Curated annotation (Swiss-Prot):
Official protein name in the record: Peroxisomal membrane protein PEX17
InterPro entries: PEX8-like (IPR055334)
Gene: PEX17
Membrane-spanning segments: 127-147, 187-207, 212-232, 258-278, 318-338, 372-392, 475-495, 504-524
Any single Gene Ontology cellular-component annotation: peroxisomal membrane
Membrane association type: Multi-pass membrane protein
Compartments where found: Peroxisome membrane
This protein's UniProt keywords: Membrane, Peroxisome, Peroxisome biogenesis, Transmembrane, Transmembrane helix
A GO biological process held by the record: peroxisome organization
Function: Involved in peroxisome biosynthesis. Required for the import of a subset of matrix proteins into peroxisomes.
Main location: membrane
Length: 671
């Protein structure tokens, strides 16, 4: 129920009440009587206006409302301004329900509209009433058909309302606002955001996009909104360190008019961006960067002073709201980058700046524990723009001029320079995680020097965790994703050849404990694929292939039979073909590696692998879980057959099939 539909004191339909309302609106009061609360005045408007029978009286009251020093003072509070919009909206909805013989609904609306349009004073005073009319029209239309036919807004009036609102809005923003109070300067934007929930202001009757963005962004970043990214720090300081008090203050902040409408503003702003010039968009992006950096720094300080703030529900909710707002606005910039032609320098710089902003607020995404669609869209769109600079060299990376500077690599160096790799603060870990996610995309196209001096060194820092594994797990997984992406690039052969021995030695101990079984198998397969003939790494150092297979074979021999895979590193139990034991996982990695072996030694490797499989039942006698050991044997036999009969080289397939049917015979030779 609307709060303004609660009857005010003495809310009957008398001339006395009408006079009383007018006195209230003018700020007059009976000598000795207490001043009437603004809410009571608004309630009287809701109950009295729909029952007025004389159009002249309605005309009078509307004029009094617009000129009221109580409702629309020069230093009006934005909350009071929003209340007036809500109250007038409720008034019109009530008028549509009033059955007493009064002025007809259409005549009542026409009178209100004419009084508002004729008002010659400041335009900002007209906007709450126009917004109330527009929102009420939406409410009445949205209610749908009822048993009692409700009157609706005439089509012509709908159009006139929208046109009058847009004209008034543009006039308000075109006037010099330097000597006006913050409230009266920003009131038009708040009104615009209010009705944008139900009316498109971007069509045939469109607002002034640039002015809306200019004043609107000032509003949402002001003390009425996000406070340039410092709101949380201020509210926690005011709470004196008490979590409950801080929660109450933040909850109140989230309900303030501007903050409550951030979602709507962000979508309007995102749609407006495509209509303004590039230089102005650049200024918008610069301001967003500053907000993001401020929020990151204040959150760092908060978490240092009180680590429990990481789990403070209201603080996290506020951060999510802020993230959503900033990403939706930047989504408009991303759309513009992907659809409009522009100077390449500005094109690349805007994408660079978008990633700068996302880098600062990635800690919020990390805090959420899941990706956010708008964030992902901006992130990958900006990366696409930066990597487009490599387009002329994609087919042959060897043609990249060694001294050519790329914006994407400048960002890579900047991220490395600002990352605190040794820090245990969650916000610092989030920054490193962002850098690794970016490097995973960049490593496939950039200079070898960037890979060797920036990307791989950063990833190396987290490849082999020795402690705090659960806390570091996202970083470990991201670091390995970077390396695996780099291993797949043929032109990284020299760098990869140097890395492989160390990397193989570091990967093998990660299962079990860090890697899930499928992560381990994937990592081994990627390494084998990188070092096997006829790869560029194999041409660089042919010994690496044998080193990798020998290391894997040793891991197979050293892994006991019948030990279950830890629950912490398994995948969903609904997935089929899950290896039953740790040894089955390691052996599976070896089996999957066999198709890369040279045909001259392929049969020997098949036999050696089969010997280890066939040894399983014997080894199971000493296993703690004999049933699991037998399941391991069955699994490995099946996987061996899948490999042999699967999609492998035809020549290898012929050798493997012949071997399979004579495998009980002795195969002569040594590995």
């Amino acid at each position: 129920m609307n709060k303004y539909l609660v009857p005010p004191p003495q809310a009957n339909r008398t001339v006395t009440n009408l006079d009383l309302l007018i006195n209230n609106l003018r700020g007059s009061s009976t000598p000795g009587a207490a001043e009437v609360d603004t809410r009571d005045i608004l309630q009287r408007i809701v109950f009295i206006l729909p029952t007025i029978k004389n159009p002249l009286n309605l005309d009078l009251v509307i004029k009094e409302i617009i000129n009221s020093p109580r409702l629309l003072p020069p230093l009006i509070d934005l909350h009071d301004y929003q209340q007036l919009t809500d109250a007038f909206r409720a008034t019109i909805k009530r008028k549509a329900l009033v059955t007493d013989p009064t002025i007809s609904f259409e005549a009542w609306l026409e009178t209100c509209f004419q009084v508002i349009t004729r008002f010659a004073g400041p335009g900002w005073k007209k906007l709450p009433l126009l917004a109330g009319l527009i929102l009420a029209d939406y409410d009445i239309s949205a209610d749908g058909p009822t048993l009692e036919r409700k009157p609706g807004f005439p089509s012509k009036l709908k159009h006139l309302l929208k046109r009058e609102f847009v004209t008034t809005f543009d006039q308000c923003l075109s006037i010099d606002t330097r000597n006006r109070s913050d409230a009266t300067k920003w009131v038009p934007v708040l009104a615009c955001i209010s009705i944008a929930q139900v009316y498109s202001l971007l069509g045939d009757v469109a607002i002034n996009y640039r002015r809306f963005l200019q004043v609107g962004l000032d509003l949402i970043f002001s003390n009425y909104g996000l406070e340039m990214g410092t709101a949380l720090a201020r509210l926690h300081a005011e709470s004196g360190g008490d979590a409950t008090t801080a929660g109450g203050l933040i909850g109140k902040k989230l309900k303030e008019p501007v903050v409550a409408l951030l979602n709507t503003f962000a979508h309007i702003a995102s749609s407006c961006i495509v209509h303004v010039d590039i230089d102005y968009i650049d200024r918008i992006q610069n301001k967003i960067i500053l907000v993001c950096e401020n929020q990151a720094e204040t959150w760092r300080i908060l978490t240092i002073e009180s680590p429990t703030v990481m789990h403070h529900q209201e603080s996290v909710q506020y951060l999510k709201w802020e993230l959503f707002t900033l990403c939706i606005i930047m989504q408009g910039i991303a759309n513009m980058l992907l659809t409009q032609k522009m100077n390449q320098f500005m094109y690349l710089q805007l994408a660079y700046k978008q990633l700068q902003a996302l880098h600062s607020i990635y800690f919020i995404v990390d805090q959420m524990g899941s990706q956010f669609a708008a964030y992902d869209y901006v992130f990958f769109s900006a990366i696409d723009v930066l990597l487009s600079e490599y387009a002329p060299y994609i087919k042959n990376r060897g043609t990249i001029p060694p001294n050519k500077e790329f914006v994407a690599e400048r960002l890579a160096a900047n991220l490395a320079g600002t990352s605190n790799v040794g820090s245990h603060l969650p916000i610092d870990r989030s920054r490193v995680l962002f850098a690794l996610n970016y490097y995973e995309q960049l490593v496939t196209v950039c200079h070898d020097s960037c890979v060797e001096t920036i990307i791989y060194p950063m990833a190396r820092s987290f490849l082999y965790p020795t402690s705090d594994i659960q806390q570091l797990k996202p970083l470990v997984e991201a670091a390995h994703s970077v390396i695996l992406a780099g291993l797949a690039v043929p032109t990284n052969a020299v760098v990869n050849a140097k890395l492989i021995p160390e990397y193989m030695g570091g990967v093998l101990p990660l299962f079990p404990g860090v890697f899930s079984w499928n992560q381990f198998v994937l990592a081994i397969q990627s390494i084998v694929n990188t070092v096997s003939p006829p790869s560029e790494v194999f041409k660089t150092n042919q010994k690496l292939f044998r080193l990798v297979l020998d290391s894997l074979m040793k891991k197979c021999r050293d892994t006991p039979v019948g030990i279950p895979v830890p629950h912490s590193v398994t995948v969903s139990q609904e997935q089929e073909d899950i290896p039953p034991t740790q040894r089955a996982v390691v052996m599976l990695a070896l089996i999957n590696s066999l198709p890369y072996v040279d045909i001259r030694s392929f049969e020997l490797w098949l036999q050696e692998t089969w010997n280890m499989i066939e040894a399983t039942p014997m080894l199971a006698e000493n296993a703690p879980n004999k049933e699991l050991a037998h399941a391991e044997h069955e699994f490995l036999v099946l996987e061996m057959w899948k490999m042999i009969s699967g999609n492998i080289d035809q020549r290898l397939n012929d050798v493997a099939i012949r071997w399979w049917y004579k495998k009980n015979a002795r195969v002569h030779g040594t590995l």
